[in-house]
């Protein structure tokens, strides 16, 4: 999945932007809920401290929608560190007054809801929905299930914006937006744009 996320991010890379995709060798294969998130932290922090620094990179994108370890990682470097959940919620509130999120498993809902509150978007968030599609199975083959849940978010929640709550859903946003006739945000593209914008602002 790391390679697929890197490919999705590359589609939003501006001229001169290069992407290095890394994944901790230890820890769970995917992050689905708080237990997986906690289990991955030692490997994530070790990888971050060993390979990422202010001189080597201009920005860091955390490609887990749970924004695992994000607040701690922001403290460790002076460059922008952006989580895809964080970026998606900010983008959603710029495009509409309300949003609903479609994620993978129900186990992730409490983490995402806590993050939404921490970012200050509790009033704009209507609901976090679970498609019950495991992270490693997300893709074009499960598109119908995710589309169904996204349509319910529009029809039942009456949200202005739909947020796709998994990095693996990045390739679905454009087509879903056209079908649902409203903005659909994936965190990978949102985080890429925010990272590049913040880097340019720092260089100005």
Where are these regions (language model features)?
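N-terminal beta1-alpha1 ligand-phosphate binding loop
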Residues: 1-13
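Short, well-structured alpha-helical segments in soluble
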Residues: 38-56, 144-159
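Short hydrophobic/aromatic-enriched beta-strand-loop microsegments
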Residues: 79-86, 121-128, 182-189
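Active-site rim beta-loop-alpha module in soluble metabolic enzymes
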Residues: 108-165
């Amino acid at each position: 999945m790391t390679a697929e996320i890197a490919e999705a991010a590359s589609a939003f890379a501006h001229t001169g932007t290069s992407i290095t995709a890394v994944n901790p060798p230890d820890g769970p294969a995917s992050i689905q809920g708080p237990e997986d998130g906690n289990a991955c932290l030692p490997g994530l922090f070790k990888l971050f401290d060993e390979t990422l620094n202010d001189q080597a990179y201009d920005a860091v994108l955390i490609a887990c929608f749970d924004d695992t370890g994000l607040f701690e990682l922001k403290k460790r470097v002076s460059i922008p560190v952006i989580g895809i959940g964080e970026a998606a919620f900010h983008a959603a509130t710029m495009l509409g007054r309300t949003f609903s999120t479609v994620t993978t498993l129900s186990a992730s809902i409490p983490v995402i809801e806590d993050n939404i509150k921490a970012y200050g978007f509790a009033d704009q968030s209507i609901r976090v929905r679970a498609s019950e599609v495991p992270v490693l199975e997300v893709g074009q083959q499960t598109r119908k299930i995710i589309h169904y849940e996204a349509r319910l978010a529009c029809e039942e929640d009456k949200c202005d914006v739909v947020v796709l709550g998994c990095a693996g859903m990045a390739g679905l946003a454009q087509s879903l937006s056209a079908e649902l006739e409203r903005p659909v945000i994936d965190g990978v593209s949102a985080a890429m744009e925010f990272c590049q914008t913040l880097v340019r602002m720092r260089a100005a």
